[in-house]
Amino acid sequence: RRQLPDDAPTAPPAAGLPWTARLAALWSPAHARATLMLWLLWFTVVFSYYGMFLWLPSVMVGKGFALIKSFEYVLLMTLAQLPGYFTAAWLIERAGRKFVLVVYLTGTAASAWAFGNADTQGALLLYGALLSFFNLGAWGALYAYSPENYPAPIRASGVGTAAGIGRLGGILGPLAIPFLGAQGWSTGAIFGLFAATLMVGVLAVALLGRETRGEQAVG
């Protein structure tokens, strides 16, 4: 049929490109900045999430709480994840993707440091809940933001490789706590490392990321 002026342009299918071409496209001058930013972002978010949350019960036991009580406290902390996710989802269309990611990642980093250095039940519950709130909010913004950085022919490859880098972080994060603990690191120092890692993600978004709110997806 005749193509009308308002017809969306047809993009070449991603499946028609070999994977080597799609990978090369991710590091082309047009997309290298976004790729570096997303790889850093996914690594820091997944590294910190699995590193911290899989070990929360053990951390609580190490701070002097009984094992059963530790699981109860962790359950209470994780309930804060839902409002964190929903508030981030609400804010990304109003304040922008970069703003939400920077704020929620910074909140996660600050909460991680505070949790690692807390020594009372009230402080642990408060900072643990804030940690859950901000971390899952950052996850929500990350899922919305990542595909908006690439055109359709390489979008799946771009997000998939970034998520793959995140998976690497998800493997290394849980291994970090027992390894560093065996080297004599305190809980505060270990969670300080997670906080510093998260701030790398903050800098990546702030310095390398672009705001995609309101942009029309490139077909």
For each predicted feature, which ranges?
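Intracellular cytosolic loops and amphipathic helices of Major Facilitator Superfamily
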Residues: 1-34, 62, 215-219
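Multi-pass alpha-helical transporter architecture, strongest
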Residues: 195-219
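Extracytoplasmic gate region of multi-pass secondary transporters
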Residues: 27-86
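A membrane-interface helix-boundary motif in multi-pass transporters
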Residues: 181-196
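C-terminal ends and interior cores of transmembrane alpha-helices
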Residues: 106-119
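Helix-to-loop junctions at the C-terminal end of transmembrane segments
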Residues: 86-96
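Interfacial helix-cap and linker-helix signal at transmembrane-aqueous boundaries
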Residues: 60-61, 91-92, 177-185
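Cytoplasmic membrane-interface "Motif A"-like loop-to-helix N-cap segments
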Residues: 94-105
